[in-house]
Regions:
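Eukaryotic RNA-binding helical-repeat scaffolds
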Residues: 1-197
Length: 197
């Protein structure tokens, strides 16, 4: 990594995706291998520049992934229901300080600090095996590697993370059941009872 970082620092021009991936590598190494990464960590001004580039090209509402209509309804329903469950402001497609995008964020009203992130697993975050020999019926989907890494990084930075699948959300019958489920999910993620309605 040291040689790659030094080569990239000296390169006059790089592709946008390369810069975004370099920032993702930096964030992951800083979160999980700070002891080894410290020796050849990028300069702070380079990190700031990469973060700005990353936020511009990969995060927030301007770059939100387009969901299918039925999936979009689930995300909206989760966000709307959260407003009746927790004291705070609910944001869809929120961009974190690190530049990473999350499905739903609940922030404190006054300080705007994050209470919790809620991720909704569906076709945009899950994948199924393409192996024709694998059993398809009842075969569990897997979370995409990039989505899983993003969640690990955010948790490592101290953010509370709650995840719900679209299928589970659709199986909840009424509004009360959905609110109770979200309350329990947020409580398990570490949100204090005082913040829950």
């Amino acid at each position: 990594f040291r040689a790659v970082f030094h080569a990239l620092e000296d390169a006059p021009v790089m592709a946008s995706d390369t810069l975004c991936q370099l920032y993702e590598i930096h964030v992951a190494l800083k979160a999980f291998r700070q002891d080894l990464y410290q020796k050849y960590e990028l300069e702070e001004d380079a990190v700031q520049s990469l973060r700005t580039h990353y936020k511009k090209h990969r995060g927030g509402k301007a770059r939100e992934h387009k969901l299918e209509r039925c999936n979009e309804k689930v995300h909206k329903d989760v966000a709307d229901t959260l407003k009746y469950v927790v004291e705070g402001t609910v944001h869809k497609q929120h961009q974190t300080e690190l530049g990473l995008s999350v499905d739903v964020a609940v922030t404190r009203r006054r300080s705007n600090s994050v209470l919790a992130f809620v991720e909704v697993d569906g076709p945009h975050s899950l994948m199924r095996s393409l192996d024709p020999a694998a059993p398809q019926l009842g075969h569990a989907s897997r979370v995409r590697g990039s989505v899983l890494l993003k969640r690990y990084v955010l948790q490592k930075h101290g953010f509370r993370m709650a995840v719900i699948s679209e299928d589970l959300w659709r199986s909840l019958v009424d509004g009360r059941e959905k609110r109770d489920f979200l309350r329990e999910m947020l409580r398990n993620a570490g949100v204090s009872k005082a913040r829950l309605i």
